[in-house]
Structure formats: structure tokens, C-alpha cells
């Protein structure tokens, strides 16, 4: 501490993240306490500091004794760890059905010393008016923390997406507040991925004293756009509308990227968003059981065009909304997070909670008798509707109305017309059940095992003989979401294998079981996504559970903890493509309806080619259609009558190959199966491959002598990213894969190590 710094009028210790029950001391003197992981804490420390070295000490109390004592006083009905709702700490810290119980404590975000004399910026609110054609009016409200003084000014500079700064605009502050207005001519609008570009403007705000000296400064990157959330009506589904254009939300549910948040890097978070855009996603739902993510993640969403469904951090439990102190704590938490994040164009909607509507009851709380706590009836209690409204409509809704009136807010999910559909995983129904649900599907999913390389990261060789080995089951959490659960992962593993065997044949070994579970997961989610995209606008959103993992595990994810793509992630590139060709087989009349689904904002023209083969690859029929599809439309564009072919060859011996060629990114293909994959008498596809390239970049061409379903490339022991995987290859139609290696290999080394496998290779022969 220098003498000059010590002379400043105000010296504040700023703690941006304390997890969670903390006492802060400076030079041995307590300056304050913290009890909310999500809040920013500032303490006046000027009188305690001295020139030279100073000591800052943060003492943390464990969370478990605290919540257990609160729970002993009054049990809160919950699906998760008893008592966890009493503390403002990330719920999944206490375990979830995809992650471990690691109840952390510590300093998890920056600590800084803030010094100022006259004034500092407290809040900058930016609103947009798109009411005039080819113009956007910006209103920037500035709020400061200041001592009574005259002559303070604010200066604003708007920099365009191409980096050109505009003329400075000034305004004099009155009572520490001021407003600056400016108009953007010929605005460049921000669009979700796949709909247009993501131009970002920078608003720089300088706080000046009467002599023009800089006192404080901040900046915000914004996108010029309008965003609406239309909740479900009797005739229309829930949907998002950007810049006046409705769009189909294609994405997944995001969970914390690590069980220990401080281990996630900006580069990793950015790569996650790049991987979303790479498979044609435009949306991610930031689920309510984690934490408010770092600015770097939202910056990446802004840049890539990923629209965020932003949950406040309340999930799967009742909360003590009858306690004024709890509500005050939440109000401050929400205010700080809304101020920090509301300017991001990627945030499409704020949502009060995840699945707490299932705990909402009548006018009074329904408490669980103490003798039934811990039994099957312990979760049957209800939160009173007045307290639910007090928390999610009045407190959080009030913060949104005050601080972000232009942002969409809904009280909960699935409480706004969206659907969480779990009859397949939890109910054990076949994938066919997905066709019986409609609307905006914001949660649904099925688990798969990780890739062999990830499995090797948490198992010993003796664990890799069976997916039922103790360590392997330990990393499957679906029926033991908290530390006190006793199930060993058997139930979740059984669920995976039940549906795998329903759809596919018996895998031949451990590694084949891992791969086949991923093919099964991709098969089910693709079946669901195709159906919902076909019926647009009856359904306007498909957001599967889940995008990522927070540890190496068996889970619902399409991309694992290490960022390795599973089969589902590769297939998402196809079923989320801007133009989707698909076929729907009707076993009653033996026809295949040919669907063309387009998210493009302009009409699409092209040729739709179809071919029918047997499982030996012999062509039995073919045709070509000239197709024009209107913008943002899905419809049947043709029909194939297979009656005679089914009669002659049997449906289990037929494949229908589809390809729509609209040029460039508008080219898409698909395969229609007339029976479950297990019923197909597949033949050895006789896969072969060649390679060209060098170093870390290669192009691999794969050929099949017989029809090959779900073909994938792998290089055991080598980290690689493939341009595509788990695709279908017909004889005479070789497929090209771009291969990106993390370390260079010679071509001979690559050809020696590379493996090309297919569904056929996973089966016992």
C-alpha cells in the first residue's frame, strides 16, 4: 500500500465471488461477512489500511453444518440435497443426476482494492428504440456513487462494429445521474447463428469532473436487435421472435463446465460455443442449478450468435420465500447479475427457475411430517403459491421490471408454455413416444457412455471389462444425485442397456458397448428432433438435455468433460442443419413421405434425389424431384410408394437414401429405416479408406462395399477432431472426412493408427 493510494477518500475491498459463508478481516479486524456465492461484496477498509504490507484474511465456514441445522428446524420439500435451498450456493455443488457432490468453499472470483475520491460509476443502462425505419435510438442512463458536488459529466462514445468511433456525446449529471441519447443510422442488426451476422457495437462511458479529468470509465458491447418471447396460446406454441422474425430454437441445455468452477478457462468456454455453432445450434439454455457464468462465456455467445435462455439459479426445490432476509439477499443477487449481464444481445430470455412449478401448491405450504422425511413421501411437500409468487413474480420479476424492462422474463420452466419431456428416460418408453409431444421442448434426453479415451481417464484396466464395474457405475449419477444417496449407478446403467437392446443388437465387447450406447442416444434424439422440426410452426424449439459434462461420466451430454464429441454431437450437425431432408415411413400404406424443412429466410431451390437399396447395396428404385421450399417452412414435398418392394424384399432388407442438393451449405442427406436397426440383417460393409494431407491436417476418404450405417473414424491414443462422424455411406458414394490432429503425424502413421468402424462392427457376429 503506497502513501498516495492511502490518501484517496474511499478505499473499498471488492470481493467478486466468495463461496459461500465467509468472514473477511483486514489486518486482523473483521470488516464484514458474506453468505451468498453469487453476490459481489464491498467493504470500507480505508481506516484499517496502512502504508506497506497489509493482511487480508477470508475465513470460510462449511456449508453442510449450516444447511443441516436449518433443515433440522424446518424441512424444505426438494428433489435434491435436503437443506441446500437455505443457502445461496450453486445447487449442483450438492450433487445432481449427472455430477458428483463436491461442496466447495473458497475465493472463486477476483478480489480487488477500489480507490476513488469524488465519484465512481455505479450502473449504465442501455435501452434501444427500433421504432423508426433504418434507425435505432439508444438511451444510455448513467448512475454514479458520488459525494455532493457540481459539474460532473458523462461522455459517451459509440464505436461501430468495424472499429470506427463516433463523435463523443456529453451530458451533465444531476444528483449523480444523467442520460445520453444518440441515434444509429443504418444500423447493423444482430442475428442468431444461421440467420445473419453478429455485429457488435461498443458503448464507452467516461465519468469526468468539472475540469474534464477522468474519474471512472466502463464499456459495454451491445448488439442492435429486438427479442420477444411469445408464450404458448391455444393456437400457437411458445416461440422466440428476433427483429420481428420468429425462429426455431435449435440447441441444448448447458450445465457448469466443471465441478470446480475456477478450473474453466476463457479459451475452453469459447471453444464450447464454437462447437455449438459448428453443429448448427442457435440456442443454449443456461440451466438454473449452476452459477451465473463468467462474462467470457456471454461474450462468446454474443460473437457466435448463440441465444441464451438464462435461468436465475433456483432449481428443483422449494425455497424459504417466507423469510424477508432471504428475499432481500436474492433481490441484491439478482440486481447485481442483471446489471452485469443485461446488455448482452445473446440473452434471449430470463427465467425465474427450473421445475419449481412442480412444488407449487395452494395458499398454504404443505409440509412433510418429520417421521416421513427421508422416505418416498419426503418430496411430496409443496411451496405455497403466494410464496412462489413472492419470490419469482414479485422479487425476481420486480428486479427485471426495474433494471431490464426491455428484456423478456418468464417465472419458470416449464411454466411458460415449454415442455420438459422425460417419459423416455425416466418412464422407460421407447423413442416413439417423442412423436406424441409437441410445442417448445426445452428438456428431453437419453444417456450414453463416454468414448473409450474418456472412460480410460477415470478407470483402471480392470474396470474396463464391463459397464457394470464399480468404478464405471460410480460415474453414472442418475439415481444418486447427492452424497447421501446409496444407489451405485445400477439403475441408470440398466436404463441405457434396456433401450440399447430395444433398438440394437448385443454389443460384442466393452468398447463396442460404449460406442453403441452413443449411437443409440443419437438415434433417439435425432428421431425426436426431426419430428419436431417437421411440424414447425406447431413446434418451435428443440433443446435437448444436455450439452456438456462437469466431470468425466456417463450422462445425457453430447460432448464430454474433455470436449470430445459424442455421436449425438456429430449427428446434431445433420438434424440441426439449416435445411433438413427427412423421410417418414408409414407401415400401414408402405409409403415414405419426403419432408423438406428449411430455416432459411429466403426460398430454397434444389434437387431431391432418392434411392432404395437392399442391404447388399443393390439399387431397387430411384427418383429425382425438383423442389422449391418457401422461407422458414416445413412440408411434404413428395412420396415414395414402397408397397411392391416391401412385398418382394421385406421392410427389414430395405434402406431409403435421401439427398437434397441446394448448393453449398444447403446440401443435406439422410437415410430412412423401415424397421428398428436391430431387425436389419446388416452385412459387413467392407470399409476402406485413403488419406491425403500432412502434419496435423488430413482428408480421409472412406468407401463402403455394402451399405454402412453410423460410420465413424477414431485414432486410439490420439486426440483428433473430425469434420463429421457417425454418418451413413452407400456403396459407390465415398465420404470425405477432414481430420484435425492436435499433434502432427506422418501419413503412414495415420493410416496405421486410423480405425473406420460402423454399426456392424459393434455387434456380436
Indicate where each model-derived feature is located:
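Short glycine/proline/serine/threonine-rich loop/turn segments at secondary-structure transition edges
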Residues: 6-9, 49-53, 66-68, 186-200, ...
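Accessory beta-strand-rich segments of carbohydrate-active enzymes
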Residues: 1-120, 283, 291-293, 306-309, ...
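Active-site neighborhood of glycoside hydrolase catalytic domains
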Residues: 303, 320-415, 562-563
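Substrate-binding clefts and catalytic carboxylate motifs of secreted carbohydrate-active enzymes
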Residues: 92, 99-106, 118, 350, ...
Amino acid at each position: 500500500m503506497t502513501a498516495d493510494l492511502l490518501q484517496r477518500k474511499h478505499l473499498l475491498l471488492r470481493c467478486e465471488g466468495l463461496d459461500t459463508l465467509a468472514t473477511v478481516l483486514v489486518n486482523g479486524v473483521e470488516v464484514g461477512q458474506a453468505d451468498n456465492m453469487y453476490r459481489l461484496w464491498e467493504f470500507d477498509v480505508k481506516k484499517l489500511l496502512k502504508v506497506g504490507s497489509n493482511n487480508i484474511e477470508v475465513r470460510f465456514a462449511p456449508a453442510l453444518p449450516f444447511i443441516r441445522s436449518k433443515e433440522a428446524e424446518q424441512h424444505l420439500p426438494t428433489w435434491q440435497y435436503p437443506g441446500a435451498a437455505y443457502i445461496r450456493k450453486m445447487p449442483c455443488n450438492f450433487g445432481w443426476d449427472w455430477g458428483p457432490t463436491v461442496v466447495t468453499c473458497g475465493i472463486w472470483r477476483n478480489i480487488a482494492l477500489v480507490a476513488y475520491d469524488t465519484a465512481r460509476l455505479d450502473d449504465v443502462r442501455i435501452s434501444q428504440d427500433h421504432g423508426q425505419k433504418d434507425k435505432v435510438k439508444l438511451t444510455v442512463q448513467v448512475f454514479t456513487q458520488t459525494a455532493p458536488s457540481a459539474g460532473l459529466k458523462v461522455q459517451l462514445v459509440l464505436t461501430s462494429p468495424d472499429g470506427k468511433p463516433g463523435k463523443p456525446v456529453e451530458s451533465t449529471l444531476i444528483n449523480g445521474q444523467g442520460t445520453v441519447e444518440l441515434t444509429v443510422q443504418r444500423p447493423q442488426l444482430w442475428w442468431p447463428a444461421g440467420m445473419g451476422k453478429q455485429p457488435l457495437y461498443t458503448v464507452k462511458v467516461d465519468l469526468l469532473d468539472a475540469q474534464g479529468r477522468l474519474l471512472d470509465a466502463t464499456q459495454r458491447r451491445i448488439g442492435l436487435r429486438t427479442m420477444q418471447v411469445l408464450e404458448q396460446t391455444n393456437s400457437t406454441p411458445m416461440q422466440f421472435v428476433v427483429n420481428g422474425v420468429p425462429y426455431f430454437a435449435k440447441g441444448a441445455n448447458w450445465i457448469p463446465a466443471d465441478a470446480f468452477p475456477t478450473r474453466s478457462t476463457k479459451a475452453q468456454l469459447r471453444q464450447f460455443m464454437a462447437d455449438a455453432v459448428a453443429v448448427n445450434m442457435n440456442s443454449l439454455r443456461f440451466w438454473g442449478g449452476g452459477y451465473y457464468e463468467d462474462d467470457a462465456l456471454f461474450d462468446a455467445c454474443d460473437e457466435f450468435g448463440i441465444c441464451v435462455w438464462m435461468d436465475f439459479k433456483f432449481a428443483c426445490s422449494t425455497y424459504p420465500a417466507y423469510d424477508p432476509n432471504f428475499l432481500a439477499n436474492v433481490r441484491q443477487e439478482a440486481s447485481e447479475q442483471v446489471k452485469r449481464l443485461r446488455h448482452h444481445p445473446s440473452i434471449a430470455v430470463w427465467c425465474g427457475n427450473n421445475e419449481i412449478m412442480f412444488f407449487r401448491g395452494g395458499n398454504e405450504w404443505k409440509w412433510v411430517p418429520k417421521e416421513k422425511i427421508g422416505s418416498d413421501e419426503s418430496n411430496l411437500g409443496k411451496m405455497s403459491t403466494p410464496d412462489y409468487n413472492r419470490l419469482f413474480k414479485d422479487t425476481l420479476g420486480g428486479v427485471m421490471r426495474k433494471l431490464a424492462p426491455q428484456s423478456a422474463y418468464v417465472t419458470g420452466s416449464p411454466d411458460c408454455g415449454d415442455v420438459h419431456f422425460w417419459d423416455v428416460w425416466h418412464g422407460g418408453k421407447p423413442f416413439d413416444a417423442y412423436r406424441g409431444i409437441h410445442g417448445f421442448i426445452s428438456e428431453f434426453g437419453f444417456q450414453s457412455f463416454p468414448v473409450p479415451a474418456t472412460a480410460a481417464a477415470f478407470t483402471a484396466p480392470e474396470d474396463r471389462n464391463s459397464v457394470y464395474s464399480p468404478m464405471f457405475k460410480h460415474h453414472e449419477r442418475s439415481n444418486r444425485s447427492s452424497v447421501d444417496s446409496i444407489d451405485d449407478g445400477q439403475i441408470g446403467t440398466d436404463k441405457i442397456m434396456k433401450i440399447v437392446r430395444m433398438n440394437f443388437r448385443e454389443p460384442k465387447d466393452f468398447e463396442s458397448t460404449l460406442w453403441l450406447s452413443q449411437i443409440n442416444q443419437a438415434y433417439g434424439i435425432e428421431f425426436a428432433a426431426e419430428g419436431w422440426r417437421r411440424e414447425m410452426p406447431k413446434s418451435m424449439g428443440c433443446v435437448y438435455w444436455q450439452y456438456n459434462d462437469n466431470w468425466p461420466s456417463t450422462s445425457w451430454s453430447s460432448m464430454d468433460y474433455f470436449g470430445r464429441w459424442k455421436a449425438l454431437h456429430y449427428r446434431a450437425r445433420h438434424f440441426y442443419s439449416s435445411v433438413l431432408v427427412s423421410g417418414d415411413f408409414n407401415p400401414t400404406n408402405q409409403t415414405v413421405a419426403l419432408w423438406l424443412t428449411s430455416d432459411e429466410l429466403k426460398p430454397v431451390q434444389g434437387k431431391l434425389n432418392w434411392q432404395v437399396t437392399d442391404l447388399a447395396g443393390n439399387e431397387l428404385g430411384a427418383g429425382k424431384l425438383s423442389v422449391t421450399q418457401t422461407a422458414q417452412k416445413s412440408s411434404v414435398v413428395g412420396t415414395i410408394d414402397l408397397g411392391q418392394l416391401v412385398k418382394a424384399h421385406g421392410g427389414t432388407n430395405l434402406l431409403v437414401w435421401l439427398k437434397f442438393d441446394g448448393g453449398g451449405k444447403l446440401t443435406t442427406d439422410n437415410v430412412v429405416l423401415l424397421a428398428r436397426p436391430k431387425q436389419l440383417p446388416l452385412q459387413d460393409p467392407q470399409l476402406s479408406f485413403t488419406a491425403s494431407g500432412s502434419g496435423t491436417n488430413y482428408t480421409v476418404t472412406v468407401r463402403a462395399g455394402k451399405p454402412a450405417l453410423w460410420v465413424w473414424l477414431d485414432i486410439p491414443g490420439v486426440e483428433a477432431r473430425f469434420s463429421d462422424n457417425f454418418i451413413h455411406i452407400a456403396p459407390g458414394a465415398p465420404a470425405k472426412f477432414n481430420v484435425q490432429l492436435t499433434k502432427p503425424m506422418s501419413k503412414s502413421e495415420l493410416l496405421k493408427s486410423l480405425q473406420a468402424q460402423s454399426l456392424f462392427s459393434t455387434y456380436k457376429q
